[in-house]
């Protein structure tokens, strides 16, 4: 499972990232990886975001910020999550994690897939 923390729905970088996950969803599935984007947005906001942008992955709401705090991604001063990626294996062990220096940047999908291949080797 790939947890992909993202700051907020309807922002330019987050929209581009969710669309990229949608475009490459089959590549993740072929690697037996479930992509789980997660943000502090409410469920209704994420549903609207998914419909408006034709996003093909289900997004998780961390509206109470509990998961973001546990994974250390919450930017307390902004009250939203930094962009981060956490790869969890079938046993629930975190195999890899990466947090961006700033929420305005993101890993390219090719980089994430390369990391998956490295871990699978």
Where are these regions (language model features)?
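Chalcogenol-based redox active-site neighborhoods
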Residues: 1-121
């Amino acid at each position: 499972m790939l947890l992909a923390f993202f700051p907020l729905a309807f922002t330019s970088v987050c929209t581009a990232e969710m669309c990229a996950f949608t475009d490459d969803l089959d590549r993740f599935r072929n690697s037996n990886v479930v992509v789980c984007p997660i943000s502090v947005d409410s469920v209704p906001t994420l549903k609207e975001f998914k419909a408006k942008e034709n996003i093909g992955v289900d997004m998780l709401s961390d509206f109470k910020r509990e998961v973001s705090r546990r994974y250390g991604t919450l930017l307390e001063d902004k009250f939203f999550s930094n962009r981060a990626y956490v790869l969890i294996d079938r046993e629930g062990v975190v195999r890899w994690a990466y947090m961006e220096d700033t929420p305005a940047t993101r890993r390219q999908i090719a980089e994430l897939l390369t990391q998956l291949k490295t871990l699978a080797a």
